[in-house]
Amino acid sequence: MALTQERKNEIIKAYARHEGDTGSAEVQIAVLTADINELNTHMAAHKHDFHSQRGLMKKIGSRRNLLRYLRNTDIQRYRELIQRLGLRR
């Protein structure tokens, strides 16, 4: 259910701004998006798993806050990221 370390490392490499970057807003948002996508598939199969639903809502809130921060600080990076992740259709 959770992201494997290998998958998380792939995401970090794909979205890192420089070598060793694990904490930039882009990386954090990409990792949260992958977690959210996995939880969405889990919730489709287990509709009454309210503990996982609460975790999903917390992750969505964290991603929303990071996206708001990125939009307010650097709109160009924000637009590129949402396009790469397929958010905001």
UniProtKB/Swiss-Prot annotation:
Keyword terms: Ribonucleoprotein, Ribosomal protein, RNA-binding, rRNA-binding
CDD domains: Ribosomal_S15p_S13e
GO biological processes: translation
A GO MF term: rRNA binding
A GO cellular component annotation in the UniProt record: cytosolic small ribosomal subunit
Pfam families to which the protein is assigned, alphabetical: Ribosomal_S15 (PF00312)
PROSITE patterns documented for this protein: RIBOSOMAL_S15
Subunit-structure text: Part of the 30S ribosomal subunit. Forms a bridge to the 50S subunit in the 70S ribosome, contacting the 23S rRNA.
HAMAP family the record matches: Ribosomal_uS15_B
PANTHER family, alphabetized: RIBOSOMAL PROTEIN S15, BACTERIAL AND ORGANELLAR, SMALL RIBOSOMAL SUBUNIT PROTEIN US15M
Function: One of the primary rRNA binding proteins, it binds directly to 16S rRNA where it helps nucleate assembly of the platform of the 30S subunit by binding and bridging several RNA helices of the 16S rRNA.
Recorded family membership: Belongs to the universal ribosomal protein uS15 family.
Annotated protein name in UniProt: Small ribosomal subunit protein uS15
Species of origin: Leuconostoc mesenteroides subsp. mesenteroides (strain ATCC 8293 / DSM 20343 / BCRC 11652 / CCM 1803 / JCM 6124 / NCDO 523 / NBRC 100496 / NCIMB 8023 / NCTC 12954 / NRRL B-1118 / 37Y)
